[in-house]
Amino acid sequence: MYKSAVILAAGKGTRMKSALPKVLHKVCGKEMVNQVIDTLRKSDIEDIDLVIGNGAEEVKKATKDTHVLYSIQEEQLGTGHALMCAREFLEGKDGVVAVFTGDAPLITSETVKDCIEFHNKGEYKATILTAIVGNPFGYGRIIRDENGEVKKIVEHKDCTPEELKVNEINSGMYCFDIKELLNNLDKLNNNNSQGEYYLTDIIELLKEKGCKVGAISVNPDEIKGVNSRGQLAEAEEILRLRINERHMENGVTLIDPKNTYIGTDVEIEEDTIVYPGNVLEGKTVIKKGCVLYPNSRIKDSVIESGVEIQSSVILESHVGKNTTVGPFAYIRPESKIGEGARIGDFVEIKKSTIGNGTKVSHLTYIGDAEVGGGCNFGCGTVVVNYDGKTKNKTIIGDNSFIGCNTNLVSPVEVEDNTYIAAGSTITKKVQEGDLAIARAKQVNIKGWVAKKGLKK
């Protein structure tokens, strides 16, 4: 059966107190609306329509790579009105449409699949996702008849004292038979205190026609919406622990899961150990047997097997097998570090290639450079890559030794098996096998301190 989905993402999110549209606030490194889209894709949903309004262009930009369609809700006149705005997307389709909200990022693909299966097997015209909660205050209640079938949804403010005792709540997420939904959308009215068109009224219309309406109860955490910064933090914590549990089940050791921050799309292979305080973001891939000591940030990078990283930042880069990084190293985008290399403390690498076995142990800047294997950089080496207008390239051959406090003024080439004397400023090509010394000859002026009256 054909399966489609509509995501309601037009709300202003006033309680967030933010210029950013609510659905674009991130949970575990990804916008809430993109979390929902990803979940629906994993649920074999064929077409997805995003109903947008507030900050529409920003939402489009953030979701441009997700292959969703868009419907515009110029005025936010309720959830029923949002489905009216998606009418063009729904017309001509047969089957089931799942309706979700863009501010509920905790729903899982397993739950979506279960809901659709429940809907189809029961031959329901509408299915409501519900949850049993300890404190149902503020939520619409699911009222069932003596046979356990859904009778109606009653908003909290309209509940009788007996109905207030019901702790099964409406999540605001549904599955509908598309044709029945379309047949009833125009029957909605806004004769209520808010002057809005409520999607819950569709349930009542269907029941009046004698249509079957079902309800499936799910984990309360999955239906939690985000309307405030506090709820955003709560969703972050729930999803973070869910992600961390998945990695541990796959053979990753997390020393302190509550204080380890791993993004939704991060991949980690078995026998890697992650200490607390690490932040792994984007499309990062950590291969087997790595050790990430406390307090590193790694984003959109590939870390090969056997790497050790201490308190460092690695962005959009590649680190080869059995390399050590840090503490306090900064590897900037488009860098590639070879195998068995050493990138030490207070070293910054930018848009450079570092060969296998090369050691850059401390207090060094390498930018826009191609460095061979087996090299050694002394403390305080700087690749002077910027002339005030252009970023220039430096090439350093294999097995070269760069002495302490050396400036390599780009563009410049240092060939294989060369030595650069400490304190040199290199501006010309150094031939293979040569020693380059580029510093003034030392001069000692006898008795100078006494002559200047500086002797103590």
Swiss-Prot record:
Annotated stretches, region: Linker: 230-250
The keyword Acyltransferase belongs to this UniProt entry's keyword annotation: yes
Functional pathway: Nucleotide-sugar biosynthesis; UDP-N-acetyl-alpha-D-glucosamine biosynthesis; N-acetyl-alpha-D-glucosamine 1-phosphate from alpha-D-glucosamine 6-phosphate (route II): step 2/2; Nucleotide-sugar biosynthesis; UDP-N-acetyl-alpha-D-glucosamine biosynthesis; UDP-N-acetyl-alpha-D-glucosamine from N-acetyl-alpha-D-glucosamine 1-phosphate: step 1/1; Bacterial outer membrane biogenesis; LPS lipid A biosynthesis
Signal peptide residue numbers: none
SUPFAM superfamilies on file: Nucleotide-diphospho-sugar transferases, Trimeric LpxA-like enzymes
Database matches in InterPro entries: Bifunctional_GlmU, GlmU-like, GlmU_C_LbH, Hexapep, Hexapep_transf_CS, NTP_transferase_dom, Nucleotide-diphossugar_trans, Trimer_LpxA-like_sf
Any GO BP annotation: cell wall organization
Annotated function: Catalyzes the last two sequential reactions in the de novo biosynthetic pathway for UDP-N-acetylglucosamine (UDP-GlcNAc). The C-terminal domain catalyzes the transfer of acetyl group from acetyl coenzyme A to glucosamine-1-phosphate (GlcN-1-P) to produce N-acetylglucosamine-1-phosphate (GlcNAc-1-P), which is converted into UDP-GlcNAc by the transfer of uridine 5-monophosphate (from uridine 5-triphosphate), a reaction catalyzed by the N-terminal domain.
Protein name (Swiss-Prot/TrEMBL): Bifunctional protein GlmU
Organism (species): Clostridium novyi (strain NT)
